Structure formats: structure tokens, C-alpha cells
């Protein structure tokens, strides 16, 4: 089974990956991993999932489907969410801190050494202290990359937005007044930029909560990132922490259970696919929402 978890940990976020688990019937417990509709791995030797390669159901969110009287749980790998912040001014600091708090990997681009140092102290995973155009050449982008443009002037905004629009992305947000953002967009349109991508750029950036201080504005920006992430892509619970724990050679002989929500009722905040790894000694990685249910599972 470690082969499956290694596949999940290393899968390309720009490919359509899918994990299937048979919940009942003769194939109960069998798993399979698909990428772009092609079967990459299957746990059983009976080939229960082989026919799915020819007729893979259209699945947009984690949940249960029924195939030939067998219930099958479908989920997607939870790719690492990446924040790329252009600019390390006052607003960027809480964005970095809250971004790390929600589990994102944070990269900051800043051409001023003093401000780059501030980003490092705030906890950014990577800080590129160089011109924005040069720094963005090192950022490949993918469907799990969220670009936040908070530079000190519209000419820098324009440079960043022009380069970012050509990359794969999950989100682009740009701070600035309406007049400033309109000016930047108009200039890029005149240079032949894709109007559809320009229209998708979140300006003004952040949810409209009336934020005034850098901290309040930072909250609104991350809130919008979270909203976009959860609106567009319902992901499963194979977080990097859980995958790291499962694949950790030091604990390979310790028994553990991977608890997964396969369906939910009511207003529980945790979606299908959410996972918690429970060790025999009571340690846990992740959470399925806390409360009495989680306590019972740990017991």
C-alpha cells in the first residue's frame, strides 16, 4: 500500500488524479489510483477497477458512487496549497503568517533587502530578493498556486500581473484602488493580454469586510483565498502531514488506522475525504472535526 501513498505524494497537481476505494462487496477495501483517466495502480489482483479506465465516471467532489451494486468512495489528492506573494510591505506580513497558519507553503518576492528580511522573520518558506520579473521566472505555477500581488506601485503590479497571467494558477488577487487596478488592466489589454484571465483577477483583493489595518486586510485576503479554494476544488484529506506520517520509516512497525469521512450529514464543517491518522499509542495526525465522534474513534 505504500506504493499508493508514494503515488499520491508525488502526483502532478496539473493532472486529474482520482483515488477510488471499494466500500463493500467482494472487492471491499480494494483501492485504485487514476491520473487523467488512466489506471496507474490497483491494490487487488482481480482487476475490479480495470473497467473504470474505459468508462471513468465524471466526479467533481469527494463522495460515494455505486457501480454494479458496489459502493465506491471517490476522492482527490490534497495537493499542497502554495501562496506566492509579490511584495513584502506591511500587508504582506499578516498574509504570510496566516497563510502558514492554514497550511500553505509561502513564497515571497521582494526587491528591497530590508523588506525581504521582514518576510523571512514573518515565517515565509522562501524569499526571493530580486526584481519581480526575475523572481517570477522561478515560479512555475500550477492549479494549486495562489498569487497575491501587493507591491508598492502600479508599475510593479503590471509587471507581476503580466507574468503571472501566463502561468497555471488557482487564484490571482491584486491590491490597489479601483482606479489603479483599472489602469493596470487597461495597459495589459492594450498589450494583448487575455481579457478572460484579466476579468478573473480579484481586484480589489480580499473579501469586503471593511478591513483597515494591515492585519484586517490580511485576514480578508486569506479569507478570499480560502473561499476560492473551497469553491473551486473540493479536495480530500491526504495532507502532506498525513502522507509524511504514513510514509515515515521510523514508525512503520507501529499499528495505525487512517480514519476517513466518506459521507456527512448536517452542518459539519469537515467534508467527505477528510482524514485523521490514529496511532496505536493514541497519537494523531490531522482531525476529522473534533468533538465526541473524533474522541470515540481515537479510543
Give the residues covered by each predicted segment.
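ADP-ribose/adenylate-binding Rossmann-like module
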Residues: 107-109, 146-153, 162-187
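Segments forming oxygen-rich coordination pockets for charged ligands
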Residues: 1-111, 118-125, 187-189, 228-299
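Adenosine-phosphate binding glycine-rich loop
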Residues: 175-243
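Short, glycine/polar-rich helix-capping loops at beta-to-alpha or helix-loop-helix junctions
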Residues: 113-119, 156-159
Amino acid at each position: 500500500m505504500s506504493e499508493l501513498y508514494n503515488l499520491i505524494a508525488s502526483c502532478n497537481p496539473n493532472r486529474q488524479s482520482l483515488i477510488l476505494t471499494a466500500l463493500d462487496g467482494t472487492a471491499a477495501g480494494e483501492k485504485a489510483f487514476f491520473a487523467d483517466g488512466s489506471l496507474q495502480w490497483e491494490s487487488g489482483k482481480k482487476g475490479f477497477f480495470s473497467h473504470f479506465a474505459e468508462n471513468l465516471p465524471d466526479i467533481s467532489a469527494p463522495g460515494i458512487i455505486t457501480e454494479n451494486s458496489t459502493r465506491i468512495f471517490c476522492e482527490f489528492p490534497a495537493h499542497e496549497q502554495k501562496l506566492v506573494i509579490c511584495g513584502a510591505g506591511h500587508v504582506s506580513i499578516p498574509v504570510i503568517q496566516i497563510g502558514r497558519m492554514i497550511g500553505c507553503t509561502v513564497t515571497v518576492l521582494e526587491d528591497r533587502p530590508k523588506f525581504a528580511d521582514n518576510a523571512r522573520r514573518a515565517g515565509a518558506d522562501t524569499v526571493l530578493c530580486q526584481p519581480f520579473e526575475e523572481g517570477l521566472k522561478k515560479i512555475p505555477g500550477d492549479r494549486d498556486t495562489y498569487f497575491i500581488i501587493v507591491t508598492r506601485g502600479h508599475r510593479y503590479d503590471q509587471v507581476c500581473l503580466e507574468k503571472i497571467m501566463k502561468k497555471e494558477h488557482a487564484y490571482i488577487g491584486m491590491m490597489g484602488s479601483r482606479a489603479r487596478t483599472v489602469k493596470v488592466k487597461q495597459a495589459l489589454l492594450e498589450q494583448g493580454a487575455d481579457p478572460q484571465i484579466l476579468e478573473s483577477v480579484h481586484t480589489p483583493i480580499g473579501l469586503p469586510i471593511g478591513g483597515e489595518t494591515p492585519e484586517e486586510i490580511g485576514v480578508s485576503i486569506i479569507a478570499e483565498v480560502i473561499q476560492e479554494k473551497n469553491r473551486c476544488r473540493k479536495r480530500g484529506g491526504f495532507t502532506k502531514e498525513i502522507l509524511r506520517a504514513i510514509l515515515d520509516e521510523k514508525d512503520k512497525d507501529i499499528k495505525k488506522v487512517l480514519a476517513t469521512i466518506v459521507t456527512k450529514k448536517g452542518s459539519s464543517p469537515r467534508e467527505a475525504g477528510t482524514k485523521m491518522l490514529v496511532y496505536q499509542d493514541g497519537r494523531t495526525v490531522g482531525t476529522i472535526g473534533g468533538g465526541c465522534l473524533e474522541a470515540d474513534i481515537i479510543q
